[in-house]
Amino acid sequence: MSFDAARWNQGKLRVHLIGVAGSGMTPLAEILLDLGHEVTGSDLKPAPARIIQRGVGFSLGQAAGGIGPVDVVVASAAIPDENVEWMEAKKRGLVRLRRAEVLGQLARGKKLLAVLGSHGKTTTATMVAQIFHEAGENPSFYLGGYAPALGASGRWGKGDWLIAEVDESEGAPTQLKPWAALLLNADYEHVDRYANEKAVIAAYQQILGNVAGPVIVVAKEETAAMDAAGSVKQKVTFGWEKSEADYLGSWEGENAEGIRFGVKGKGKDLGTFAVAATGRHNGGNALGGLAMAAELGIAPEKIRQGLQAFRRAERRFEILVSEPALEVVDDYAHHPKEVMATWKAAQARGRERIVAIFQPHRYTRLATFMTAFAEALAKADLVVLLPVYAAGEREMEGFGVAELAAKIGELGGKVEVAGSMPECRTILGKVWQEGDLFLFMGAGDVTQLAKKVARDFGTFRAVRDLVKGEGVVKWYEPMNKHTTIRIGGPAQVWFEPESEEALGRVVRWCGKEGVPLTVVGRGSNLLVRDGGIGGVCVHFGQPGMSKIEAEGGKIRAGAGARLKQIVSVAKANGIMGLEFMEGIPGALGGAMRMNAGAMESWTFEAVESVRVMNREGKVSEVARGDFEVKYRKVPRLVEDIAVGAVLHGKPGKPEEIAEKLKQYSRKRWDSQPAAPSAGCIFKNAEKIPAGRLIEELGLKDTSVGGARISPVHGNFIVNQGGAKAVDVLRLMEKVQARARKDRGIDLEPEVIVVGEDE
């Protein structure tokens, strides 16, 4: 359906953006809002909060019903023709436009300043927009990342200029007619579209052929860019010393505040310019933006003010954390040249080590530049590789992270491979050293990991400072080491207190700061989700919280005391009645919270009193009679923390106790699987034990992924190797659905499920 471009300025339209959270669609949403249009959008990832706050109706996920009563539907080239919403728009006869078409239509009413290049477009376009803003030009801008100093990634201003980065990844946008253009470089990129470097140069030549006014192009150091601009008449060059460019920069240095360089413009000394950016490559970007602004009549002093006001665009060497213990930097680098330039900028920060966390973007790009990526990454002190962000591409055998890791190793680099984001966090927690710089790079969702690591480190550092050596504090401790089923992502902060006083300090801090606090015992009857446990995870593994003493026919024990050890001490002191605990693979604290049982006996039958800490860090001794005790649950101990208890038994001879233990051991080995498990997975139903029900349903030996219902006991799910929490949960759902359908029984989980999904 045809669409008159003038309609964008002739009253409100209802516009739906497919993929609104993308870096090319979010600025378009902001521009359309500025023009007074009603905007809705959908995406498979969350949209920036700022556009939702401005009124964009956002839907997470895409469906035919996701398009309401709208006039226009817009999608980027990344959205395939078979996208369900794109197809629905066609079915309904709605106006359908690609993002580049809309940008071209909007640009007709402005003087378009196009920023071009394989790298550096967002940073440079942001610099130019900032210069024009400070010069009072009230420009419109369209940027590939959020500009903090401008408060948006897209804006429709009242001035004549539209500053836009123009992406060549979709081919030469012939519908654009720039008034002026800035070409930063023309490296071989987007290998899924262009066969070779000549094809890339040809695309830029086509774009530059449509430019009405000056073309600012980087000088000799970028020969491909000069080739692309070879036939341009109004060509103005910029570059560093010895390039003989029209705008000649001289590097003056870099410090914590940014970079400084001097400029001579067409033989005239323009003075020194400073910009809050890192690295010589960003100095080149600033020099190019300066040249464009100067050629379009912006005074040097206004340019200087604009560059001083500039703040890095989102994900362009964005420093998320900077403190002596750790610096975390997030960057969009996804081409070997970008990786190299970003590493050089990181090196200039003067940290102890650089740990590069890299997520390759597209298999085609990795396959084409495998060796170049390895050479750039091997310069880091340590490389952690994430799975390839496919961006819709199919996997290419022989061109994955395993091959990249091997090449880095051949070059002498140290490398670790993470199979997932949670595994990467586990690796980072293991390798972190005081003074490190964590450099996250990639064009995919690695940015979410970078932001999480930056946030989580603050919690880790705060807890470590609170503890003051009275216990163990670890960052990103893998929970599969601490659960009997050997499953679970990392704990954000793992804390083993040595004393009640240290525990109380952390408990009070968590309550004040709103940080989740989870207490885990020996990890039986516990399933930790694959994303791990957020906040602080407390484990009573230190001697100060796991003491066991026998006195007057009773046992006083800390919450961290292993049940097996409690039984051993009881036996040595002639205390009978605790033998059932010997086979429960847990600690006292967890056993009390769950009222764990075995051999027809229950933990709270042996409890005389419990020492508890509330969430304000206050400790009190509570008698057994003051607790409500339920099947597999003691409600008060879900909130309050059991830090110890007094247990009672009856007098018994050691040989009698030993015989009882042998009987229980034989029974347990005959009826329970030896493979890693969380113990009984479901509570018994009112009329039938869960294990027997599962057996009668014919579900023994059923598996999902690496999780399997034990052939020995139907109420045990075992980890047969490499199982994930999601496998166990899906298998549990399968059992519950079958029990409900065939028997009308709702099976309630006995296992406690904690944490967040991957």
What do these predicted ranges mean?
Residues 475, 526, 613-730, 734-758:
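Phosphate/pyrophosphate- and phosphate-bearing ligand-binding catalytic cores of soluble enzymes
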Residues 113-118, 564-608, 677:
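A gly/ser-rich beta-alpha-beta helix-loop segment of oxidoreductase catalytic cores
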Residues 3-16, 24, 28-31, 35, ...:
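Nucleotide phosphate-binding/pyrophosphate-handling subdomain across enzymes
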Residues 488, 495-500, 527-546, 593-623, ...:
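Structural signature of FAD isoalloxazine-binding scaffolds in flavoprotein oxidoreductases
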Residues 374-434:
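C-terminal helical cap/extension that packs against the catalytic core
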Residues 6-11, 31-37, 52, 65-66, ...:
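Phosphate-binding loop of NTP-binding sites
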Residues 37-50:
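NAD(P)-binding Rossmann-fold cofactor-contacting core
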Residues 463-588:
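Anion-binding (especially nucleotide phosphate/pyrophosphate-binding) glycine-rich loop
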